[in-house]
Swiss-Prot record:
InterPro entries in UniProt: Restrct_endonuc-II-like, tRNA_endonuc-like_dom_sf, UPF0102_YraN-like
Origin species: Shigella flexneri
MF-aspect GO terms: nucleic acid binding
Region Disordered: start-end pairs: 1-21
Annotated protein name in UniProt: UPF0102 protein YraN
Organism phylogeny: Bacteria, Pseudomonadati, Pseudomonadota, Gammaproteobacteria, Enterobacterales
Length: 131
């Protein structure tokens, strides 16, 4: 677990959710700095969650944010398994349908923003609905 300093100066432990939220906020700011526009965060649809939905031009970008302290076992990007990709695709499909769209009618892609230690890696079009 990560720690953050408090007003008293002594560090406190962050929960897994707080750590994830902090990295998602960092990814959002980083992507906005690259010119993407924020649409939504923590979108839940039938058991799946999309960390961030952004827009780059006319493209809707579904973003999975990952953090790992080190590159052991492949680092953050390697943790987006085929099973996780399938869940993200299903969640995006449901979100698009809720917003009167589909993969056939909306230009979209799936990106991964991976933080490994102090490094950030942006994998554009990391996978797609044809994977």
């Amino acid at each position: 677990m990560a720690t953050v300093p408090t007003r008293s100066g002594s560090p406190r432990q962050l929960t897994t959710k707080q750590t994830g939220d902090a990295w998602e906020a960092q990814a959002r700011r980083w992507l906005e700095g690259k010119g993407l526009r924020f649409i939504a965060a923590n979108v839940n649809e039938r058991g799946g969650e999309i960390d961030l939905i952004m827009r780059e031009g006319l493209t809707t970008v579904f973003v999975e944010v990952r953090y790992r302290r080190s590159a052991l076992y492949g680092g953050a990007a390697a943790s987006v398994t085929r099973s996780k990709q399938h869940k993200l695709l299903q969640t995006a499909r449901l979100w698009l349908a809720r917003h009167n769209g589909s993969f056939d009618t909306v230009d979209c892609r799936f990106d991964v923003v991976a933080f490994t230690g102090n490094e950030v890696e942006w994998i554009k079009d990391a996978f797609n609905d044809h994977s």
